[in-house]
């Protein structure tokens, strides 16, 4: 058995504390997997990494960096899976400028272009593989 959770820290709600200071109390001895995390960005859109509403690659990359910092504080963490690899069509995404019928949480755009957060996750997984 494993425990899997979806947690969108920094996207749907702000961080309650600095990511590096987030303490997780895991009350089970089972392996824990973060089965979904991330946030949306339009490929090629630049903006302030501190402004969630910018939908920028810089904000998405910061969000991933923050989550990676938090992962170090999670007991029993055995794996993480960003939501999602590619941007995809979604009929329930109504923001006319940034979504227009697309879920933009992908690490890769719908045209196959790698967003800045893709490189962060590649480096994260490479580091984990080598440890």
Where are these regions (language model features)?
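Substrate-binding/catalytic cleft of secreted carbohydrate-active enzymes
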Residues: 1-127
């Amino acid at each position: 058995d494993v425990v899997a959770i979806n947690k969108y820290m920094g996207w749907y709600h702000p961080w309650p504390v600095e990511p590096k200071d987030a303490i997780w109390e895991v009350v089970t001895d089972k392996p824990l997997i973060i089965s979904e995390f991330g946030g949306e960005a339009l490929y090629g859109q630049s903006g302030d990494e501190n402004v969630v509403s910018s939908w920028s690659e810089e904000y998405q990359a910061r969000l991933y960096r923050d989550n990676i910092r938090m992962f170090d504080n999670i007991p029993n963490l055995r794996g993480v899976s960003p939501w999602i690899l590619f941007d995809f069509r979604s009929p329930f995404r109504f923001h006319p400028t940034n979504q227009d019928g697309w879920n933009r949480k992908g690490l890769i755009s719908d045209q196959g272009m790698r967003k800045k957060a893709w490189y962060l996750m590649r480096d994260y997984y490479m580091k984990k593989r080598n440890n």
